[in-house]
């Protein structure tokens, strides 16, 4: 009897908590504001001179995408889709940058295994993910931010679906560039 009441109470509490939180994306923290300067950052990377700052891409559109972890199925699919469309982004003066809590060595191995040619940044302490409202405990959430050539945040994608996400970002980029 006690066990049944305990399970019922536990289930009720979990359901109530689930209903109080509108969606998992809200758990990542406060999102930066659209049409305001995007939070500046500098992080280690697997490419170039070893560090990348947002300001390095002044004059270009930036597709800044956060993802949970190298070598997981959804993250691998998302990265491969961005890579497949890389020339389309380049034709639109856009740079793709991936961010996760993985270290540089993991990013190097991930790029070697998947053929990804754009930079991946190592946000091992979550500081940049937190600044973008994309951090949940020990990893980044799957969020993407479109930043214009002047460093202004123009679009936020939450609840990303890896199989179609790159196409969605390209479509929105086209709208914003008109």
Question: Where are the predicted features?
Answer:
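Bacterial N-terminal signal peptides that target proteins for export
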Residues: 1-11
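N-proximal helix/coil linker or "cap" segments that precede and/or mark the start of modular domains
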Residues: 5, 17-40
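Short loop/turn microsegments at loop-to-beta-strand junctions
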Residues: 39, 61, 141-143
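A short beta-strand-turn-helix
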Residues: 41-62
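Hydrophobic beta-strand anchors of alpha/beta hydrolase catalytic cores
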Residues: 63-64, 96
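Structural microenvironment flanking redox-active thiols in thiol-disulfide oxidoreductases
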Residues: 74-114, 124-130
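Thiol-/selenol-based redox modules, centered on thioredoxin-like
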Residues: 140-178
């Amino acid at each position: 009897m006690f066990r049944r009441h305990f399970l019922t109470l536990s289930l009720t509490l979990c359901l109530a908590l689930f209903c109080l939180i509108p969606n998992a994306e809200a758990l990542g923290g406060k999102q930066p504001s659209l049409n305001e300067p995007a939070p500046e950052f500098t992080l280690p990377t697997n490419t170039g001179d070893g560090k990348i700052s947002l300001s390095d891409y002044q004059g270009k559109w930036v597709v800044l995408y956060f993802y949970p972890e190298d070598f997981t199925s959804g993250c691998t699919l998302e990265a491969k889709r961005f890579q497949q469309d890389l020339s389309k982004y380049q034709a639109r003066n856009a740079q793709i940058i991936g961010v996760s809590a993985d270290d540089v060595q993991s990013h190097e191995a991930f790029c070697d295994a998947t053929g990804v040619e754009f930079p991946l940044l190592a946000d091992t302490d979550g500081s940049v993910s937190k600044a973008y409202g994309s951090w949940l405990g020990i990893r980044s959430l799957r969020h993407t931010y479109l930043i214009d050539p002047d460093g202004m945040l123009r679009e936020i994608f939450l609840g990303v679906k890896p199989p179609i996400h790159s196409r969605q970002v390209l479509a929105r980029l086209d709208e914003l560039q008109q």
